[in-house]
Amino acid sequence: MAWIQIRLNSTNEKAEQISDFLEEIGSVSVTFMDSQDTPIFEPLPGETRLWGNTDVIALFDAETDMAEIVRLLKEAKHLDSNTAYKIEQIEDKDWEREWMDNFHPMQFGKRLWICPSWRDVPDKNAVNVMLDPGLAFGTGTHPTTALCLEWLDSLDLKNKTVIDFGCGSGILAIAALKLGAKSAVGIDIDPQAILASRDNAEQNGVVDRLQLFLSDEKPSDLKADVVVANILAGPLKELYPIISQLVKPNGNLGLSGILETQAQSVCDAYTQTFALEPVAVREEWCRITGNLKTL
């Protein structure tokens, strides 16, 4: 069966309203896509997990009168002269198979591979993390996640404790455990992230060494040898008092989710208590690492 797709450029403020309206007028499915290839990170409590510039994509069956759909969208003021949209016919495909074909094992550093569960691992002697793309939030494909994974791979984590602050899928905590860490803690504001991290830890056989907490439920005396936080520059600066207290004396800190243009302001926030290393840059994103200073 063929389908007709309409794609409308919108904003995160309007996307959900448009989605609801499209479903009311007969769409069989509605999805959101980033208009500018920017990543989604953890939202603040109560916020919708959307991009700043969002495309709303709706599928209708092939017999749908799309001129009438456009008329209804305009009548409801979801389309105007400033709204870009595109209508096209879509072939029926095995969408699940096509989606799966897009994901391949990826290597980070010298030892670490992230592999979808339906793929054979390229090196059985490597450190292999099995992680399937899904609703939560980090599978290694974005430069910030890659920078953090490569940093963890470069550390000697044997018998170390690790905190993954803003754990999302749990990818960083799980990678640390499989790279030799004694134990890890994942912290997030989103209950869905806690569930996803636990599921992924079970899949990788490390759930017995991973503790998970919502951010407002973490122990007050929590500290670790290594702390990694892949969130955003603004929250990293705002959360400096909290994040810095999580690092043991001489412990390692890794921060990412930071645009290169924001690196200096984040460094300025942390340099008072951390001896920072040169900033690592990939594409327009960067990673800041350092050690907690001791008096």
UniProtKB/Swiss-Prot annotation:
Methylates ribosomal protein L11. Its EC number is 2.1.1.-. GO terms for molecular function: protein-lysine N-methyltransferase activity. Pfam families: PrmA. Keywords: Cytoplasm, Methyltransferase, S-adenosyl-L-methionine, Transferase. It is found in: Cytoplasm. The keyword S-adenosyl-L-methionine applies. The keyword S-adenosyl-L-methionine applies. Belongs to the methyltransferase superfamily. PrmA family. InterPro entries: Ribosomal_L11_MeTrfase_PrmA, Ribosomal_PrmA_MeTrfase, SAM-dependent_MTases_sf. One of its GO terms (biological process) is methylation. It comes from the Bacteria. NCBIfam families: prmA. Its main location: cytoplasm. It catalyses: L-lysyl-[protein] + 3 S-adenosyl-L-methionine = N(6),N(6),N(6)-trimethyl-L-lysyl-[protein] + 3 S-adenosyl-L-homocysteine + 3 H(+). SUPFAM superfamilies: S-adenosyl-L-methionine-dependent methyltransferases. S-adenosyl-L-methionine binds at residues 145, 166, 188, 230. This is Ribosomal protein L11 methyltransferase.
